[in-house]
Amino acid sequence: MTLVDELIKGLLPENEEKTVAIYAGGFKPPTRGHFEVVKQALEEHPNIDELLIYIGKKERDGITQAQSLLVWEIYANYLPLKVELIPTSTPPIKAVYNYAKNNPETSVLWIIGAREGDDGDFKDIADRTKNVDNYSNIALAVTITTNTASGTAARNAAKISMEKLKPLLPDELKDEEVIQVFDIIKENTAPNHVVESKAILNWEKRVTIPGPVPPAFLEGDVLTYEG
């Protein structure tokens, strides 16, 4: 049992359940959007005694669990002490179910973020929570935000510059903390490579290649694109 658990246990009446909120995901890396989900969830559910952030192990585009934890630790400077960061080797969704199973007397509030107007997010939520009815002590709490920052966008921004990354980070961060986050993220994110094709094209003509290849740019007579 953690120190937070001991303190909460002493404050709760004997017959009152503890409410533990869980926010689980990959967070590769954590963004402004993830941070706002936590803040908003705490505001919308003042009965939360403890909020656990489960950080998944799976690496994404060079960003590791350790890097994600380091970034969250910076964000935690602006979150209450009831927030606890937990790296997990178990897939995040399974970790939520495991916690509920192992703590049947605890009321578990499963925090899930969704971007306003993003139908894909709501479909994803339905897929991820299809087994939730098997756990009587889990209640879903979908937190809808207007921020569209994603881990993918942050990874791509970090490949370009700190200036591109900054708008995807919490406004609360000091300048030196923005630098710290950028340094953490860029460590394993390689910059986009310029790939040449043998196609000979007209000078300064911008083209788009059908299929998955990004918009192309010309250098001299050789087609190049960022991949």
Model-derived features: positions:
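Nucleotidyltransferase catalytic core that binds NTPs
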Residues: T2-G227
